[in-house]
């Protein structure tokens, strides 16, 4: 199976670590991975402030796989939010499955990720995030009240004011990208096949800023997504309006084959049941 990587940033200690967690493969990506990582972290850190951004394996690689997952740990539980922007695509292209932020910063702070270097810097010494990273090759995250704003447009709404909890004011993410694709001819052919399924995307094209990997620019692109979507598209973090495309196991299997993942039809067909069982068991532990 693929090597899977989590970038964990500890605000309290001012440290960062790249963690190899092969068990992520069992959860594919996106929302299931974000919840699995929380469950794993809570086993040894029951009270430490925790949040994460998690990508999917098709972000930045295939059309309409254009969203990311923000998870916020709250008292006796968690919330997940789906939104757009370049962040999930850049994460996946850099082979980072999840960006975990733990602890509380001593001062209002920014996180700066440049290539593989991670810095936690004093916000008051810098007027904005714009002085970090390369425009066009970075994603910026701003924490504003109960909204998280990615790339100055894409919203991830939350239940609480994150910056008041952990003193984090923003993130500049500008990694090196090195995602490996197998047969390039097969990839281009499959990409075009999915792109041509635009009529299956249940939203009207517009002239708004598009999510990364989507040509439609719909009126909902900047909104927090609150659609009730099946677990497989949530693991791939496709747009909810493209659920019909990424709920098709034959298409998903073909995409994984091109990207050299080892998932087979049996695994994909059983995935929803397995994740349902996992979520029920984890949620029971939160109720205790």
Outline where the language-model segments fall.
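Intrinsically disordered, low-complexity segments enriched in small residues
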Residues: 1-82, 86-112, 118-288
């Amino acid at each position: 199976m693929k090597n899977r990587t989590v970038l964990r940033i500890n605000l309290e200690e001012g440290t960062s670590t790249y963690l190899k967690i092969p068990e992520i493969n069992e959860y594919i990506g996106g929302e299931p991975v974000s919840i699995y990582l929380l469950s794993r972290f809570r086993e040894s850190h029951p009270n430490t402030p925790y949040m994460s951004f998690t990508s999917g394996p098709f972000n930045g690689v295939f059309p309409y796989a254009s969203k990311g997952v923000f998870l916020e740990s709250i008292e006796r539980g968690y919330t997940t939010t789906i939104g757009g922007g370049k962040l999930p695509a850049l994460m996946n292209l850099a082979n980072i499955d999840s960006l975990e932020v733990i602890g509380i910063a001593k001062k209002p702070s920014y996180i700066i990720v440049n290539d593989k270097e991670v810095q936690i810097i004093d916000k008051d010494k810098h007027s904005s995030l714009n002085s970090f990273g390369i425009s066009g090759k970075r994603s910026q995250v701003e924490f504003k009240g109960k909204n998280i704003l990615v790339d100055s447009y894409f919203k991830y709404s939350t239940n609480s004011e994150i910056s008041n909890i952990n003193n984090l004011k923003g993130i500049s993410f500008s990694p090196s990208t090195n995602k490996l694709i197998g047969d390039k001819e097969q990839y281009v052919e499959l990409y075009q096949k999915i792109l041509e399924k635009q009529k299956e995307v249940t939203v009207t094209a517009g002239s708004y800023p598009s999510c990364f990997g989507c040509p439609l620019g719909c009126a909902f692109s900047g909104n927090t997504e609150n659609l009730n979507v099946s677990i497989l598209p949530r693991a791939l973090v496709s747009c909810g309006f493209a659920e019909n495309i990424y709920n098709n196991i034959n298409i998903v299997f073909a995409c994984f084959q091109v990207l050299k993942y080892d998932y087979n039809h049996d695994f994909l067909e059983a995935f929803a049941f397995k994740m349902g069982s996992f979520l029920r068991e984890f949620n029971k532990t939160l109720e205790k």
